[in-house]
Amino acid sequence: MSDGTVAAVRGVSFEIPEGAFLTLLGPSGCGKTTTLRCVAGLEAPDSGEIHIGERLVFSGSQGVAVPAYKRGVGMVFQSYAIWPHMTVFENVAFPLVHGGFRVPRSQVKERVRKALELIGLAELGSRPAPLLSGGQQQRVSLARALVYEPRLLLLDEPLSNLDAKLREEMRLELRELIDRLKISTLYVTHDQEEALVLSDRIAVMRDGQILQEGSPREIYLDPLNPFVASFVGKANFVDGSVEGQKDERGGIAIRTPLGQLICAPRLDLTIGEQVSVVFRPEDVHVRTDSSGHDRNTFPGVVERVIFVGNKILCEIRVGSVLVQSEINARFKLQQGGKVTVEISPECIGVIRHKQ
């Protein structure tokens, strides 16, 4: 999809299995919301095809463009779009009375009652919308999207307007609800933790393209390129070159400014190949003594210590490299203190420079 000068979405392709939860994750302007709006029928792509189930709802080559109200999708917007002049019941009932999925009036009350029960607001049907809290408005918006039993649920950053604590609670409630309903879901967010908690699959986007798609575990532990590694969580990067096999356990030796690092990559690497090694701050073990294994163990000096409640964020100078680490909040470190840093080979990823 393009505005004539810049392609907002390029070559994006994905499939959501029935009942699965797929998240489009990326920074602002990466094309994730545009992609969702194309699926919803609120934007028209320049080319390609979109299928919802077995139904073709868009095809550039065949001239098919099913309007949004006929696609059978439920959508929750970032702003919730709750009508202030209506009650909770009237907001949820709207698509059954005025939308493209009208049902006999005799069925409206029961459908709305079930939808409100699903989201825990069965007692608030008569309440005016302006009297709802932010969390309640989010639930009403979700009930309205589910009341006509759509085949696909689309959610565009629905939790971003909530405070941090309520957002965490709503993540779990939303995932539990989706599991109960077994409804296919496409979710858009820039929040990495939100994507990891909610999703069966994550597609990381940048500049209108999907850079990597996989399970939350794959995306976090096995990033394919530096952008995915740094955008999804924090990461340490160190450039190096492959030296060869190191030991009988299949570890690969990589020469880096830290020294020789032994890695357990899932890639076939050649001697002399230029790579970047990547490891997470929580996988950097810090000790105040010099004991430990000789593999991937280096002396360092603490340059910065930040207490954040449940953990300590610290920066440790190892040679010419500044290594980030996250450690238990009860572990005592002082700026300028000498420490030993150890990184397990199994916790080190390898990214080819050509990627």
Q: Model features per residue range: what roles?
A:
Residues 46-49, 207, 239:
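Conserved coupling/switch loops of ABC nucleotide-binding domains, chiefly the family-specific signature
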Residues 40:
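Helix-to-loop junction immediately C-terminal to a conserved catalytic motif
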Residues 48-60:
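Conserved ABC transporter NBD signature motif
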Residues 15, 51, 340-342:
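ABC ATPase nucleotide-binding domain
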Residues 25-27:
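The feature captures the beta-strand-to-loop junction immediately N-terminal to the Walker
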Residues 221, 253-303, 330-355:
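Glycine/charge-rich catalytic "coupling/switch" loops of P-loop NTPases
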Residues 72-74, 78, 82-230:
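ABC ATPase nucleotide-binding domains
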